[in-house]
């Protein structure tokens, strides 16, 4: 994952609205805790977040949930509990969902995180991981995200942030992407800003012609 994967995404400047819930934990249901969260509404962090958001805000905000096919149980629970006020997205999210929303909420450190950072789309993360399995370098990135008010360890804290800042998300985000810590994060994750396909193909062809299997 990196510049070769994301650099062909076409950016648009259309007016964005609403919040997209983009869960990744649904992709890892083999883990017991994740299985419980994916299929039990009251254990699901997106439901907790939705409940904590002010009633007045919920009347104004357009919510969409990117629902993984395996989460039919969760979908039915959402529809019943919200009186069908939340919409579901099923499209491939690469490059054509995040950019349409005022804010994206993710719950894991997987592909959506890298795409959002690469394209500088406004987002927050809700994750209470103890970070034991991460490298020291990635832990530094997570600490930067936390200090920028992008990473939250509880649904209540994330909801408080949304309640306070939703109307000014664009202004907040424009300040975030100019901050030194965000630039450090982006540089750490994407040392190559843009992937040069022609250069790669030419280099590959040259090495093949030489009979050298090492690509420079």
Map each language-model feature to its residues:
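Catalytic binding pocket for nucleotide-activated donors in carbohydrate/polymer assembly enzymes
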Residues: 1, 78-83, 103, 108-190
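C-terminal alpha-helical cap of glycosyltransferases
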Residues: 183-216
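Soluble or luminal CAZymes and related metallo-dependent hydrolases
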Residues: 38-48, 150, 157, 196, ...
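Residues at the C-termini of beta-strands that transition into short coil/loop
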Residues: 2-4, 23, 65, 92, ...
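Active-site donor-binding acidic/aromatic loop of nucleotide-activated sugar
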Residues: 83-92
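Short acidic alpha-helix that forms the nucleotide-activated donor recognition element
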Residues: 91-101
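Conserved catalytic-core segment of nucleotide-activated headgroup transferases in glycan assembly
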Residues: 4-80
